[in-house]
Regions:
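Short glycine-/polar-rich loops that comprise or flank the Walker A/P-loop
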Residues: 12-17, 63-66, 140, 169-171
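Conserved beta-sheet core of the metallophosphoesterase superfamily
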Residues: 244, 270-277
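Glycine-rich phosphate-binding loop used to anchor ATP phosphates in small-molecule kinases
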Residues: 1-21
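Short, solvent-exposed loop/turn segments at secondary-structure junctions
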Residues: 26, 104-105, 179-180, 240-243
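Short hydrophobic beta-strand that contains or immediately precedes a catalytic carboxylate
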Residues: 99-101, 144, 173-175, 235-236
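Active-site neighborhood of divalent metal-dependent phosphoester bond hydrolases
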Residues: 44, 137-139, 151-235, 242, ...
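Conserved GTP-binding G-domain of TRAFAC-class P-loop NTPases and closely related GTPase folds
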Residues: 11, 23-83
């Protein structure tokens, strides 16, 4: 019953994956005939293989995040399993860190803050493309707590700074609810365009097509939270329960974005947050 496996994974905020072993009908019949405790014939094996192949097509819809298929005995023999940390798990990064809260489009203030913290911020322009490089002489790293955009006068330069710092390894960025809303708008999803988002949209209209095209991947790659410094530090936008740290699920992302909610929405269409801390 694969449904119970999916439910178990979700309960513990894990990402379910599937490994499908399908070496072919002939191999399955041969292996079945070599087992004296299996009295059913080849037709039963054919039906079972056919059913398994039909069900494979729905594994992603069932909730499996990744599916690996091994289609021969050689593939099975050659397969290895490697444990890979989830993208939230950056415990090996020990900093030191500067944690920066919601910037909300205030690029000048962000640059002033970074300068006061000892970062070198250098702007350049080539072929009409505005670029920025940010580094710290002592290799400190910024951790942005989300909500880079909306409300402020210059969300585009805030994005430039954050994108440059992530690309160079000078920063981590977790996703805020405003960042996710912009991501959804860029993907053509239906969102409520309130005052803050409209400001960001207007600012983006003045940017190059290349810059606008670089945003969807950056925003979609933002993690729900980041786990740092050998497990001593976890950073999320709205908060996170201890059992969710370092885990990956839709529930973890929603909690990190909005905190614990009551299930209701306010007059702005935003989730009503419960007092949970």
């Amino acid at each position: 019953d694969r449904k119970s496996w999916i439910e178990l994974a979700r309960r513990w905020h894990a990402l379910p994956v599937a490994i499908v072993i399908d070496p072919g009908i002939d191999i399955c019949i041969e292996r079945n005939e070599s087992r004296p405790d299996r009295p059913f014939g080849g037709e039963v094996v054919r039906r079972m293989v056919s059913e398994i192949r039909r069900s494979q097509r729905g594994l992603e819809r069932e909730g499996f995040r990744q599916v690996w298929k091994l289609t021969s005995p050689d593939a099975v023999d050659a397969a290895t399993m490697t444990r890979v940390p989830l993208w939230t798990d950056k415990r090996g990064d020990e900093g030191p860190f500067d944690i920066i809260g919601d910037v909300h489009g205030c690029a000048d203030e962000l640059q002033e803050l970074l300068t006061k913290l000892g970062y070198d911020v250098s702007w350049s322009s080539a072929d009409g493309t505005r670029k920025v490089a940010v580094s710290h002489p002592q290799r400190r790293k910024a951790v942005f707590v989300g909500d880079l955009v909306d409300r402020g006068p210059n969300s585009t330069d805030v994005l430039r700074i954050a994108m440059s710092m992530v690309a160079s390894g000078a920063a981590h960025v977790v996703q805020g609810n405003h960042d996710r809303k912009l991501e959804r708008w860029l993907a053509g999803r239906k969102v409520t365009i309130a005052h803050g988002l409209q400001q960001t949209i207007d600012q983006l209209q003045a940017e190059s097509e290349g810059f606008r095209q670089s945003l969807p991947k950056f925003l979609s790659d933002l993690r729900s939270h980041v786990w740092l410094d050998q497990g001593r530090l976890a950073v999320a936008h709205a908060g996170l329960k201890a059992e969710m740290i370092g885990r990956g699920s839709g529930a973890v992302r929603e909690f990190a974005l909005f905190g614990e909610t009551t299930g209701e929405t306010d007059e702005f269409g935003l989730p009503v947050r419960a007092d949970w801390a």
